Amino acid sequence: MTLARCPALCLLFVFLTSGAATATDLVNPLVTQRADPQVTLHTDGYYYLAATVPEYDRIELRRARSLNDLGKADAKAVWRKHAAGPMSANIWAPELHRIGDKWYLYFTAGRADAVFDVRLYVLENAAANPLEGSWVERGQLKTGWESFALDATTFALSGQRYLAWAQRPPGGSRHMTAVYIAKMDTPLSIAGPATLLTKPEYPWETVKYDVNEAPAVLVKNGRVFMTYSASATDANYAMGMLVAKDTADLLDAAAWTKSPAPVMASSAASGQYGPGHNSFTTSPDGKTDILVYHARNYRDIAGDPLRNPDRHTRAQPISWRADGMPDFGQPVPDGPTGTPRH
């Protein structure tokens, strides 16, 4: 039977037998009331979730053999805020990373007497299982200047480890953050000065607040994709993206190309609003790339969006275009979804 005689049937067969189409169906939301989600698939076969809890008072971890099981997995509080001083308020955006033979948690924290005077901090654990052992405070991760700093992530490329994070630029306004990158010389410190990669400039990045924050990195197809989130944390929140060649000097701002439009934004059609603060993981076999992010399933919020608990952890497969660029599409509706959407 030739393709000309059965185009629809044959194309359907190709689609259903592709790696993306056979990815395990995901059911959204994965976990309710968990914002800023970061999921890592470790070599032990477990997915680990670190995310912001609505109380902003602790760091929780949970693990499961599948993404869908994270919602019913036991959550363990591995660290709690201090009563006063540094690390005593606004515990935000924890990220779990295995570096060498230890686990590290990078997180944001303020002070009880100045809750929005946030900085970056690090915890360390030598146990094989990060839900066990002892998490040791390793102090503030210094960025080179003191100002509002949050949302640290780390990645390695060609033997070099990098830190990316958001911070108010020197001389920047109170409600402005930009995304920076620097090389790391240890898991606890950066080496040399930081490079500013993106600051708010487009209208969709400056709704209510001038915000670029929450960088996340995916290396694929000879490129480094760095997503980030922009604007206020309500329905205006949206994802942007920077792209560089994986052979480029990542500390050269000119090596990066910035998308002029959001790569994911609110969708009335799917009923999901304010998607962002994402991370990346894969299917268990590593064949399907998966976007993990938070969103609300309603648009209008009463009061301060930061006090609203309903940013839910969600996930969906990533589609890849013929030119090697990711197509995140729109946030999918609540319920099951498995195939990448365009």
Model-derived features: positions:
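Bacterial N-terminal signal peptides
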Residues: 7-18
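Carbohydrate-active catalytic/glycan-binding domains of CAZyme proteins
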Residues: 6, 22-342
